[in-house]
């Protein structure tokens, strides 16, 4: 991530929303450059670290919170739960998301794990930590990204426009107090270790659309190619 002004790194609405933590974002850029200088790398690739904030701030109507990027090289693309379209063996969490998508809405299994079409529908796929080290899950948690992503959520809430949050797992549910009176769908994480404890059968996609319509917003078209 090059040392560039925030407005050159993210969409204009996000640049304004994240201005209170611009210093923290710059510090995280310094941290990542220091990692590279020390012979260590990070995921996702630099151009994708802030990718979640490249979709229009004002268009976000659903927030899906993840933990941190997939640590397997070649998978993470800067959107929570999504992987590069070239990835053939999908992570277990994503397989379970697709299974629930079919159960909930009857949609066929997508051809790949790239969730970019959801972002074009106003779905923000946001990890709490935006980077990690290769093959080291949660390596960059507690380094400062949480300050950035929590500010992002506060800014979304402050808009006063329709928003539904989908909180999978304890880490995501810990963000519930930031959401005020806005609706949230909470369940177990889609990980194979926990999906049977409340994720399967939770119908997050249809419920999100129901909650959007109640707020006067258009539902999301959850279909993926």
Swiss-Prot record:
Q: In which family does this protein belong, per the annotation?
A: Belongs to the uracil-DNA glycosylase (UDG) superfamily. UNG family.
The molecular function terms of the Gene Ontology recorded here are: uracil DNA N-glycosylase activity
Q: Which UniProt keywords apply?
A: Cytoplasm, DNA damage, DNA repair, Hydrolase
Grouped into one coarse class, the protein's main location is cytoplasm
| SUPFAM superfamilies noted in UniProt | Uracil-DNA glycosylase-like (SSF52141)
What is the uppermost EC class here?
hydrolase
Q: What does this protein do?
A: Excises uracil residues from the DNA which can arise as a result of misincorporation of dUMP residues by DNA polymerase or due to deamination of cytosine.
Q: Which organism is it from?
A: Streptomyces avermitilis (strain ATCC 31267 / DSM 46492 / JCM 5070 / NBRC 14893 / NCIMB 12804 / NRRL 8165 / MA-4680)
Q: Which InterPro entries match?
A: UDG_fam1 (IPR002043), Ura-DNA_Glyclase_AS (IPR018085), Uracil-DNA_glycosylase-like (IPR005122), Uracil-DNA_glycosylase-like_sf (IPR036895)
The positions flagged as active site in the entry are 68
Can you state which reaction this protein catalyses? Hydrolyzes single-stranded DNA or mismatched double-stranded DNA and polynucleotides, releasing free uracil
Which cysteines pair up through disulfides? They are none
Does Hydrolase appear among the keywords? yes
Q: GO:BP terms for this protein?
A: base-excision repair, AP site formation via deaminated base removal
List, alphabetically, the Pfam families matched.
Answer: UDG (PF03167)
Q: Where in the cell is it found?
A: Cytoplasm
Which EC number(s) does UniProt give?
3.2.2.27
GO cellular component terms given for this protein? cytoplasm
Name by which UniProt lists this protein: Uracil-DNA glycosylase 1
